[in-house]
């Protein structure tokens, strides 16, 4: 058994948790130099957590990334100082780069979890 705690922890869909684990703990983004290794690690996570619908995993990772950068932008524009600091520090660009990387390697990542 494992417990995963996020800043905004709340009950939610299991696939959302697993997608977030893959994104954050595997560092899915431009710093990954070995796509096959990242894909194997995704498979290990899927198997370890017995994810029943792994075919949706990569699209859910992309959903999280899109939601994250858009949320930072929206909240920063609305005057949230913490989100403005994140944006100013380059967090939006980092998440967008991660999104692009996952999109670029989507086929390999999806094959690994099927």
What are these regions (language model features)?
Residues 18-50, 65-74:
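Active-site activation/catalytic loop segments of kinase-like enzymes and analogous catalytic loops
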Residues 61-63:
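Eukaryotic Ser/Thr/Pro-rich intrinsically disordered, low-complexity regulatory regions
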Residues 3, 42, 87:
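Sparse, context-dependent recognition of short Cys/His-centered cofactor- or disulfide-binding micro-motifs
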Residues 70-114:
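ATP/Mg2+ or Mg2+-diphosphate-binding catalytic cores
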Residues 1-17:
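Active-site acidic catalytic loop and adjacent metal/ATP-binding pocket
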